[in-house]
Amino acid sequence: MGQFISFMQEIPIFLQEALNIALVAVSLICIVKGLVNLYRCGLFQLMVFLVLAGRSCSEETFKIGMHTKFQEVSLSLSALLTNQSHELPMLCLANKTHLYLKSGRSSFKINIDSVTVLTRSEVNLTSINLTRSIDVFVHSPKLGSCFESDEEWVVAWWIEAIGHRWDQDPGLLCRNKTKTEGKLIQINISRADGNVHYGWRLKNGLDHIYRGREEPCFEGEQCLIKIQPEDWPTDCKADHTNTFRFLSRSQKSIAVGRTLKAFFSWSLTDPLGNEAPGGYCLEKWMLVASELKCFGNTAIAKCNQNHDSEFCDMLRLFDYNKNAIKTLNEETKTRVNVLSHTINALISDNLLMKNKIRELMSVPYCNYTRFWYVNHTLSGQHSLPRCWMIRNNSYLNSSEFRNEWILESDFLISEMLGKEYSERQGRTPITLVDICFWSTVFFTSTLFLHLIGFPTHEHIRGEGCPLPHRLNSMGGCRCGKYLPLKKPTIWHRRH
């Protein structure tokens, strides 16, 4: 008796669902069969194409789908290379022979030739206070007798970066800074006799941080490196890639792997570095060009799942070093070493090595400064930014990786539909069956429109759709965007 009473109580619910199904059926038959079928036949699309096609030839009019656009984002690393004391060093190679080093307000020129300027004297640092007019023979990174305090640390850092080991390798000659001839340090890298292994090691270090330099010394001949202060050339521009090579060369330890141990909490920051809740905004930190959107916790969640994305590497790099850069000019040079170790642990990994191999093999690679993503204009959702590859020192044209951003658009739409499906299933799990059923009815009722219909646009046979451009008989764009290709054209119904 109790079960029967429960069944009778549920009858109004069943009747209500049946009534809803009847209303949906009437709506599909009366409205969808009249208006949607006309839309699906292609007549309206053809009229719109003939009226609007060729009106604009700008790149901004290209769309992947109905609501997805191809966009890009560029990063600037100028915050890492500011003109302050104890900043990250900058390196420059001019005319493949002139080597330069700059950090803060100090800059140096590195000459490599066979001319001997300094000679060794039987005086060490302990007696330099008594004899300040002779050259100094040093075995440690303490170069206070050779350079000023703001120059000493960067010169010692550079010497260590090219492969010199203070506790094992031969000492260096430097001119006493009290002499009027000027500051100078001399390193013997002659690849002869007992100095051959030391010379080869320093040569390889120079080749690593100064890519493309010409070797002025030959096997068995005398070869000396001379470092002296000199103004920074005007034709040398800041290049973060050279700084990355320098930091990776001078690292003391290498992280074998890199994974996120916990979910990162990101926050908005203003130009002064003050935090505000709501996500992580690169634009407010002046690392992304203006008028671009902020990437919030959605992008960071994707970075926690995908560990091989160059864009995620850049986010981690900025997060790890934001506080270190802020205190870089206020603390001692030990802070710079900590910063270099942190950066090296992030960039000296398999991903950077893979990109460097691609560069050497003339294969497109990533330089971590420009990224592209697919943005859904209605919902505001976007895909995880991906690196814009480089070949022969120039960015690839967007048409060269067209398939990638089209697939990225498909993945974004699929992700949005899957999320919407999960939300609807959680809200109305019973009605979901009805929606699927009537979706099948809708599909079967409009299937015949695929057999008869109007073409919607014209494009080159076998090529991609040129929307919103209109083609002429020679396969070129009527507005002059593309040159005539002398290829046959064909009318299509859908893009």
From Swiss-Prot:
Zn(2+) 2 binds at residues 457, 459, 465, 495. Disulfide bonds join 92-236, 281-294, 303-312, 366-387. Residues 34-58, 456-495 are cytoplasmic. The record marks 33 as: Important for GP-C-mediated membrane fusion. GO terms for cellular component: host cell endoplasmic reticulum membrane; host cell Golgi membrane; host cell plasma membrane; membrane; viral envelope; virion membrane. InterPro entries: Arena_glycoprot, Arena_glycoprot_zinc-bd. Pfam families: Arena_glycoprot. One of its GO terms (biological process) is receptor-mediated endocytosis of virus by host cell. Keywords: Disulfide bond, Fusion of virus membrane with host endosomal membrane, Fusion of virus membrane with host membrane, Glycoprotein, Host cell membrane, Host endoplasmic reticulum, Host Golgi apparatus, Host membrane, Host-virus interaction, Lipoprotein, Membrane, Metal-binding, Myristate, Transmembrane, Transmembrane helix, Viral attachment to host cell, Viral envelope protein, Viral penetration into host cytoplasm, Virion, Virus endocytosis by host, Virus entry into host cell, Zinc. The record marks 58-59, 261-262 as: Cleavage. One of its GO terms (molecular function) is metal ion binding. Gene3D superfamilies: 6.10.140.1590, Arenavirus glycoprotein, zinc binding domain. Glycans are attached at residues 95, 188, 367, 375, 392, 397. Belongs to the arenaviridae GPC protein family. This is Pre-glycoprotein polyprotein GP complex. It comes from Tacaribe virus (strain Franze-Fernandez) (TCRV).
